[in-house]
């Protein structure tokens, strides 16, 4: 059985990406915040700052967070550095630079550094639009879906990004507390391209020299046994596996997943896809879960057996969720994935 994969992004403009489902996502890079492993107080304060910032994304509903082990491009940087060497010591300097590259690559294979990248789905602005304008736009969207189903595609407006600039600026202001920076069009292309060059040595300048969308996906993806993927590109090949995080501790206090990932001695990408959910849709599920927990507790009491800590903590967590829903607090549903690459 063969699967036809399509690249989801149709067009980009600066840090904005228009996807084929007509949603627009804005991308930002968040600088690392240096915190020592033992500084629990600073970790707690940073988590509060991040939580407060995330609440401001509620109206946008969808967002994703990626912790990316980016190729440090050591050899490329050393080449650039060699241009600054004095003429009378160039030979020695180049020898030392080459020695440094050889030692580090021999030990680490591909030296890397971690980048935090956040993507937020933007809302289209309709300020000043009349009812007639909104009705016309709704009809156009419906017509486009019909045309897409028949294999046709609407012509894209060259200024499609103008309708999203206001919301993008609002999001950028919300991220200012974390010193976020907008991705340039070049950076956005490179981050997209890196997904198909995982753990494959390459020169960034060479990758950026061919920036057509076709060049992003020129990697051949082969599905192997055991849940592995093999990436074959003009630059080399590597193996990738995607591991969904299936179980989290009930109590999140002291749980620093991003920190644990960075402690590993091999590159692992963390990707979190999240959505602010309609709390009205989970009330039925909460009620059924509460009934199930109550029956388990009553059965344990009637049989005079000790209840497992996991069941007790789950019941406490469910009560906490019901309280938050009752107080109309924002609830996020998310999935976390680890992407491991090797050669």
Regions flagged by a language model, labelled:
Residues 1-343:
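Extended, folded cores of ATP/NTP-driven motor/assembly subunits in large transport
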């Amino acid at each position: 059985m063969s699967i036809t994969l399509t690249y989801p992004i149709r067009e980009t403009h600066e840090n904005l990406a228009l996807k084929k489902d007509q949603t627009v996502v804005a991308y930002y890079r968040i600088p690392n915040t240096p915190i020592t492993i033992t500084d629990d107080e600073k970790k707690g304060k940073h988590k509060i700052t991040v939580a407060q910032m995330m609440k401001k994304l509620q109206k946008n509903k969808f967002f994703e967070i990626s912790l990316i082990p980016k190729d440090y491009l050591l050899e490329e940087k050393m080449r650039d550095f060699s241009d600054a060497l004095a003429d009378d010591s160039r030979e020695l300097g180049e020898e030392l630079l080459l020695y440094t590259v050889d030692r580090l690559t021999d030990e680490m294979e591909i030296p890397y550094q971690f980048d935090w990248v956040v993507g937020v789905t933007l809302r289209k602005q309709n300020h000043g639009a009349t009812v007639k304008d909104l009705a016309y736009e709704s009809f156009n969207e419906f017509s486009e879906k019909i045309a897409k189903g028949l294999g046709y595609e609407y012509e894209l407006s060259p200024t499609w990004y103008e309708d999203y600039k206001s919301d993008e600026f609002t999001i950028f202001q919300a991220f200012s507390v974390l010193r976020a920076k907008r991705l340039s069009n070049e950076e956005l292309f490179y981050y997209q391209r890196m997904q198909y060059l995982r753990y494959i040595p390459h020169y960034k300048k060479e990758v950026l020299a061919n920036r057509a969308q076709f060049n992003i996906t020129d990697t051949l993806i082969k599905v192997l046994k055991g849940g592995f993927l093999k990436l074959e590109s003009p630059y080399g090949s590597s193996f990738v596996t995607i591991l969904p995080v299936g179980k989290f501790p009930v109590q999140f206090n002291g749980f620093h997943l991003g920190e644990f990932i960075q402690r590993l001695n091999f590159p692992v990408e963390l990707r979190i896809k999240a959505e602010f959910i309609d709390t009205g849709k989970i009330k039925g599920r909460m009620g059924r879960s509460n009934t199930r927990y109550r029956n388990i507790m009553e059965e344990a009491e009637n049989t005079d057996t000790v209840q497992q800590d996991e069941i007790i903590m789950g019941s406490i967590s469910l009560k906490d969720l019901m309280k938050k829903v009752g107080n109309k607090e924002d609830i996020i549903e998310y999935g976390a994935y680890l992407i491991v690459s090797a050669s």
